[in-house]
């Protein structure tokens, strides 16, 4: 019966949602026509009740009949002390600076980061409720953004709470300095008594550093036992923190663990648009799409690519078209995605595809408009984009040197006069060259 119910639910949600929200989901008991489900924590319980109530209701009714009901329970962690009161508001103070650009409003949500985003937002709205929150993911996926978004949200909405954002390296350095200066008590007072929300970035930096791990362990316990919120970020999940004390890893896992996955192409496009909005810049849609399609390893590089294009546009006073973007961003594209290509032979094939003229017509002496236009476009792109020599172009297109020079000039003059149709064809040819060069 249990497996039938789970299978019925699974057929009603997509694979991504199942992996994201139902990973800790199970049937705890079936008593008559009532099903009791269990999940890993309160956050998931409330999310499923809010977003998937009808799905669960229909599933249990299909298996047990129309009178079937259900409830969701969660495994609550028992703290070391009996203290369970909400956070007591303290004097208004931000103990460490935060980047004002790192807000929930500026964070673009997609399938790969939805769970982490909503978990962080809930922690910001209800400090101490999901404790600790452990966010992990690869470089440049938004961990620091979410971590500081929590801090910025709390500062704006709960100004009496004391927020501290630190990197693990900063925590280590503070500890070392306090020991050298004989001020260990002041260190412990700072991190254990004078903070309501502790945000720790890059905890993997402490791998192999047993002494500071011990200090972090006791700091964690004291804050948690006092109902203070702890949020930790890492580039890997807790159980993969090698050379970390087991007791500390278990503390990281006892709350809410959320993974950040690389954004899909549509999310990257949305992120790129948001970055443009923040920078108050503009780029053509085809350029933005090119960046999102090809700079896909992390968001820092995506931002770097956009900044480079905007700086070029500002310093030169020129608009950035697709051709220019491809040239400017060659260092941002993964080298293993670039394949060798015969420049002009493949160019002729692409021109034929874009214009509708056959390869034979392009290389013939035909003077019909389609063939003539295609031929001139091919020579222009070969000269200005592929940077081929006039001699090579003449040989490949079966034309004399003067004819090539004249053809390139005619296209250039036509573009200067604002021939939008011709420009569109050339942009399409260049775009196809880049897609082929970057495929695989």
From Swiss-Prot:
Protein family: Belongs to the DnaA family.
Region called Domain II, residue ranges: 69-96
Subunit details: Oligomerizes as a right-handed, spiral filament on DNA at oriC.
Chain sites annotated for binding ATP: 140, 142-144
InterPro entries for this protein: AAA+_ATPase (IPR003593), Chromosome_initiator_DnaA (IPR001957), Chromosome_initiator_DnaA-like (IPR020591), Chromosome_initiator_DnaA_CS (IPR018312), DnaA_C (IPR013159), DnaA_dom (IPR013317), DnaA_N_dom (IPR024633), DnaA_N_sf (IPR038454)
Superkingdom, natural source: Bacteria
Start and end residues of each stretch annotated as Domain I, interacts with DnaA modulators: 1-69
Record keyword DNA-binding present: yes
Any one Gene Ontology cellular component term annotated for this protein: cytoplasm
Subcellular location field: Cytoplasm
Comment, domains: Domain I is involved in oligomerization and binding regulators, domain II is flexibile and of varying length in different bacteria, domain III forms the AAA+ region, while domain IV binds dsDNA.
Role played: Plays an essential role in the initiation and regulation of chromosomal replication. ATP-DnaA binds to the origin of replication (oriC) to initiate formation of the DNA replication initiation complex once per cell cycle. Binds the DnaA box (a 9 base pair repeat at the origin) and separates the double-stranded (ds)DNA. Forms a right-handed helical filament on oriC DNA; dsDNA binds to the exterior of the filament while single-stranded (ss)DNA is stabiized in the filament's interior.
UniProt keyword list: ATP-binding, Cytoplasm, DNA replication, DNA-binding, Lipid-binding, Nucleotide-binding
Region feature (Domain IV, binds dsDNA): 314-440
GO MF term list: ATP binding; ATP hydrolysis activity; DNA replication origin binding; lipid binding
Protein name: Chromosomal replication initiator protein DnaA
Organism: Thermotoga sp. (strain RQ2)
Record flagged with keyword Phosphoprotein: no
One Pfam assignment: DnaA_N
Region (Domain III, AAA+ region) location: 97-313
Single biological process term from Gene Ontology: DNA replication initiation
